[in-house]
C-alpha cells in the first residue's frame, strides 16, 4: 500500500540528496565533476531526454488503453507514476513524475511502504556524453558494471537500505514495485539531485536506473 504524505516537495528535495549519497556510494555533494567539456549543455540535454521518454510513454499508454481498456497494463510495458511526495489531487507537470519501462514482473504481491527496508539490484546510467557514447555507469550494486553481473542470481550483490533513504524518484519507484520486478526507471533531475553535483554525477542529471526489487521487510 502506498503511504500518504504531505511533506513539501521543496523540503524533500533538500533532504533526499543527503540521504541517498551514502547508500549509493557517490561522493560528497561538495565535490565538483570538474569536466565541463564532457557534459556540454547538460541540463538541456537531460531535460530533453526526459521529455522524450515521457512522450514515448504517454503515446504507448494511450494506444494500449484505446485497444485494451482496463487491461491495458497487460499489453504495455510503460508506466508513469506521480511522486509520492505530491498530493495527486494537485495539478502537476511532467517533472513531478517518473517514467518506467517494465523489463520483468515478479509474482503478484505487496509493495514496500515508506518505512520498510529493501534489497535492490541496480545500475545507474547517465545520458550519453563525449567520452561515454552509451552513457556512463555512475553506480551499480554488483561486482561489475554490467547487467550480466548485477542481475545474475549467482553474482548479484543487492544493496539494502530504507525505502525512505533514497532520492524522491527512486523512492517513488520502490513504492510501486513488487519483489521480482525489474524496471528501467527514468527520474527527472527535479526528483533526483537537481543542481547538486558529485565526482560521478553532474548537476541536472536525469537518472536512468535499471533496478530490481529483491525483497523488502
Question: Whereabouts are the PLM-identified features?
Answer:
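C-terminal motif of bacterial Sec signal peptides marking the signal peptidase cleavage site
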Residues: 24-28
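Cross-family detector of peptidyl-prolyl cis-trans isomerase
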Residues: 2-7, 29-217
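Sec-dependent signal peptide recognition
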Residues: 13-18
Amino acid at each position: 500500500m502506498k503511504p500518504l504524505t504531505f511533506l513539501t516537495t521543496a523540503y524533500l528535495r533538500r533532504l533526499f540528496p543527503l540521504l541517498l549519497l551514502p547508500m549509493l556510494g557517490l561522493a560528497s555533494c561538495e565535490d565538483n565533476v570538474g569536466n565541463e567539456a564532457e557534459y556540454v549543455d547538460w541540463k538541456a540535454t537531460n531535460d530533453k531526454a526526459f521529455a522524450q521518454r515521457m512522450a514515448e510513454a504517454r503515446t504507448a499508454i494511450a494506444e494500449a488503453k484505446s485497444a485494451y481498456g482496463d487491461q491495458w497494463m497487460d499489453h504495455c510495458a510503460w508506466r508513469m507514476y506521480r511522486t509520492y511526495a505530491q498530493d495527486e489531487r494537485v495539478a502537476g507537470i511532467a517533472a513531478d513524475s517518473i517514467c518506467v519501462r517494465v523489463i520483468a514482473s515478479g509474482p503478484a504481491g505487496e509493495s514496500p511502504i515508506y518505512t520498510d527496508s529493501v534489497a535492490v539490484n541496480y545500475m545507474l546510467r547517465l545520458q550519453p556524453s563525449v567520452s561515454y557514447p552509451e552513457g556512463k555507469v555512475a553506480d551499480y550494486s554488483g561486482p561489475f558494471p554490467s547487467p550480466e553481473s548485477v542481475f545474475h542470481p549467482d553474482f548479484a550483490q543487492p544493496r539494502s537500505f530504507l525505502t525512505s533513504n533514497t532520492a524522491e524518484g527512486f523512492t517513488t519507484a520502490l513504492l510501486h514495485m513488487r519483489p521480482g520486478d525489474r524496471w528501467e526507471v527514468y527520474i527527472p533531475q527535479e526528483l533526483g539531485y537537481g543542481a547538486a553535483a558529485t565526482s560521478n554525477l553532474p548537476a541536472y542529471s536525469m537518472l536512468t536506473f535499471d533496478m530490481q526489487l529483491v525483497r523488502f521487510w
